[in-house]
Each structure stands twice: as structure tokens, then as C-alpha cells.
UniProtKB/Swiss-Prot annotation:
GO terms for molecular function: electron transfer activity; FMN binding; NAD(P)H dehydrogenase (quinone) activity. Induction: By heat shock, salt stress, oxidative stress, glucose limitation and oxygen limitation. This is General stress protein 14. Its EC number is 1.6.99.-. Keywords: Oxidoreductase, Stress response. Disulfide bonds: none annotated.
Length: 175
């Protein structure tokens, strides 16, 4: 299975978790990691190139830190520009039908804060629903996300283990 990881962190060079994830995933021959902020420092996304890349892979992974209960802005811009009517959706937009979409998300807060009654009031599943809705619209199979909670409190060993677990997780088959 060919996997395309779109790593979207505006400060990847100083990131703790997302940088470790990208480095670990890059070690695998069937995984291509693209750092979108490095690829497009001016945010001028090459739509044709991105669409072609998406067509070449079986599974697409959006990797990002949770920013204001969503993704960093470049991922939203990427979706707005790349997932076009007639290509990704609409009566003739079937380029991604049958492919898989997965999210790899890191949060600053602990897991217990992402639930009813928790500090953030909503589960991570609820907060990520727009990605699931997008996946449904464009005919992709939405897979369970990989979430690493509590980056702000994580030990280096936990981060290293999370990178290895992520590599295993995104390569496993989902029925």
C-alpha cells in the first residue's frame, strides 16, 4: 500500500511530536512524507501537482497539531484548492473514490480534557467531524485517527514510541 503523508505544521523545525513523526515515517519505503509548509513557504499551492500525487497513493494521511480545535491554516487552504468540484466531488469528481483518509493529530492537552465535562467540552472525534464529512463527500473511506494527547507534558521516550506506533498504525490494513 502506498501512503502519502501531508505533514502540516507551521514550525516543523521546532516541533517536538510532528517532527519526530515525519522523521520516523520517512524511513519507510511505502510512505512519502511531504511537509506542506516547507513545500509551499509562500502558500502558493501547486494544485495540479497535489492532485496528481493524491491519485498515485492508496491512503492519504493528514498529519498536524490541533490548532484552535482544527488544523493549521495551510491544510484548510490545501483542501479548498486541491479538493475541487469536478475532480474530488460532483457528478464527475471521483478521483479519490475508494481511497482512504486518515488523520494523525497531536494535542497539547491530555485526553481527559477532550470529552463532555472536560476543559474542551468535546471529544476529539467530535472536533474532527469536518474531516470525516469531507472524506464522505469526496468518496474516501475515513479511517480512525491516530491521536497523541498531551504533547505539552510528554517525555521524550513517549514521543519516540508514539512515532514508531504511528508508523505501524498508518500501515495496517483496516477492514
Amino acid at each position: 500500500m502506498k501512503i502519502l503523508v501531508l505533514a502540516v505544521h507551521p514550525h516543523m523545525e521546532t516541533s517536538v511530536v510532528n517532527k519526530a513523526w515525519a522523521e520516523e515515517l520517512s524511513k519507510h519505503d511505502n510512505i512519502t512524507v511531504r511537509d506542506l509548509y516547507k513545500e509551499y513557504p509562500d502558500e502558493a499551492i501547486d494544485v495540479a501537482k497535489e492532485q496528481q500525487l493524491c491519485e498515485e497513493y492508496d491512503r492519504i494521511v493528514f498529519q498536524f497539531p490541533l490548532y484552535w480545535y482544527s488544523s493549521p491554516p495551510l491544510l484548510k487552504k490545501w483542501q479548498d484548492l486541491v479538493l475541487t468540484y469536478g475532480w474530488a466531488f460532483g457528478s464527475e469528481g471521483n478521483a479519490l473514490h475508494g481511497k482512504e483518509l486518515m488523520l494523525a493529530v497531536s494535542t497539547g492537552s491530555e485526553a481527559e480534557k477532550y470529552q463532555a465535562g472536560g476543559a474542551n467540552h468535546y471529544s476529539i472525534s467530535e472536533l474532527l467531524k469536518p474531516f470525516q464529512a469531507t472524506s464522505n463527500l469526496i468518496g474516501m473511506k475515513y479511517l480512525p485517527p491516530y491521536v497523541f494527547y498531551g504533547v505539552n507534558y510528554a517525555a521524550a521516550e513517549d514521543i519516540s514510541h508514539s512515532a514508531k506506533r504511528l508508523a505501524e498504525y498508518i500501515q495496517q490494513p483496516f477492514v
